[in-house]
Design a protein with these regions (language model features):
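PEST-like low-complexity, intrinsically disordered acidic/proline/serine-rich tracts
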Residues: 2-274
C-alpha cells in the first residue's frame, strides 16, 4: 500500500506530513464483483465506472516511519546502502538472536511479519514532509496529553484504563491512520454504492465509510472516528472526525481531523496517503 501524503490536523497539534508510497502487493483475495475495464485502462473498475479498490492489501515495509537520526542528511539510499540497511535492520530485529533471557511475555521471530525490505525508491523514512523526515516538535498540549496517558497506564486501577492495543480493542497499526508495524499488516477493502468498508487484520476492526453522508455524527464518539467518503475523479477521499479520546493519533486530541486518500496506481498497487 502506498502511504503518500499525510495530512493530520488536530487541536493543539498540527502536523503536515507527506508519507511516501508504500506499495501494496497484489490482493490475495478479491470479492466477487462485476468489473468493467476498458482496453486502454489498466485500473480495474466496477460496473459503475469507479475504480475497484477491493481486495486484501499488504502494507508491510521496514522503511522507518521517521528518519533515523544517524541518517539525518540522507533522504534516499543508494542500492548498495539499501541492501546494507536491510541486512543490518533485519539482523537487529531478529528476536531469535537476542541473548537477554530476562525478558518475559514476548514473541520469538516466528510471529513477526514486518517484511524484510525498504521501499523500492530507497527513501530513509515514510515521512517526506517535513524535509528532515521526522514528526515536528510536539506542542505543550500534546506533550501534556502524552504524559497523562503514560501516567494513566502506569497507575491503572483496572483494565478499563489500560491501553487499547494491550486489551486488543484497537490494533496498533490499524489506525486510522494505518501505519506499517510488527505484524498483521493487511487490510481488506469492500465497496458498495453506500459504503466502503475498511477491515484491518489487526484486531479485525471494521471501519464503515459512509459515501452518501453530508455531515459527521458528533455522538457517540467512536474508536475509529466517524468517516465520510467521496470520489474526486479516481481518488477516494475519506474525512474522519469525532474520535474517542483514547484513540487520537500521535498524542493529538479527540478533536483530530484526518484525511485519507486511496487510488489505484496499477492493477496490483493501491496508493494510500493520509
Amino acid at each position: 500500500m502506498a502511504i503518500q501524503n499525510t495530512r493530520i490536523k488536530t487541536a493543539g497539534l498540527l502536523l503536515l506530513l507527506c508519507v511516501l508510497a508504500v506499495p501494496l502487493l497484489a490482493p490475495s483475495i478479491v470479492p466477487n464483483e462485476i468489473r468493467a475495464q476498458s482496453a486502454n485502462d489498466e485500473i480495474p473498475r466496477l460496473a459503475n465506472g469507479r475504480p475497484d479498490i477491493q481486495g486484501i492489501w499488504d502494507f508491510r515495509t521496514i522503511t522507518p516511519f521517521q528518519r533515523p537520526e544517524d541518517l539525518a542528511d540522507i533522504e534516499v539510499l543508494t542500492d548498495a546502502e539499501a541492501v546494507a540497511f536491510e541486512d543490518a535492520e533485519n539482523e537487529r530485529r531478529d528476536r531469535d538472536n537476542f541473548t537477554d533471557t530476562s525478558t518475559t511475555g514476548d514473541y520469538n521471530q516466528f510471529w513477526y511479519d514486518r517484511g524484510t525490505e525498504i521501499l523500492d525508491d530507497g527513501r530513509t523514512s515514510l515521512i517526506v514532509d517535513p524535509a528532515n523526515g521526522r514528526i515536528p516538535t510536539l506542542t505543550d498540549a500534546a506533550r501534556n496529553r502524552n504524559q497523562l496517558r503514560t501516567k494513566a497506564a502506569q497507575e491503572a486501577a483496572g483494565v478499563e484504563v489500560r491501553p487499547l492495543s494491550e486489551r486488543c480493542i484497537m490494533g496498533f497499526n490499524s489506525g486510522p491512520p494505518m501505519i506499517p508495524s510488527a505484524y498483521n499488516n493487511n487490510v481488506q477493502l469492500v465497496q458498495t454504492e453506500e459504503f466502503v468498508l475498511i477491515h484491518n487484520e489487526m484486531v479485525h476492526n471494521i471501519r464503515p465509510v459512509k459515501m452518501n453522508a453530508s455531515s459527521h455524527l458528533e455522538v457517540p464518539r467512536k474508536w475509529e472516528g466517524d468517516s465520510i467518503g467521496r470520489w474526486e475523479a479516481d481518488t477516494l477521499i475519506i474525512e474522519t472526525r469525532n474520535f474517542a479520546r483514547e484513540t487520537a493519533f500521535g498524542n493529538s486530541s479527540a478533536n483530530m481531523y484526518l484525511e485519507e486518500k486511496f487510488w489505484m496506481i496499477d492493477a496490483d498497487t493501491l496508493g494510500y496517503e493520509f
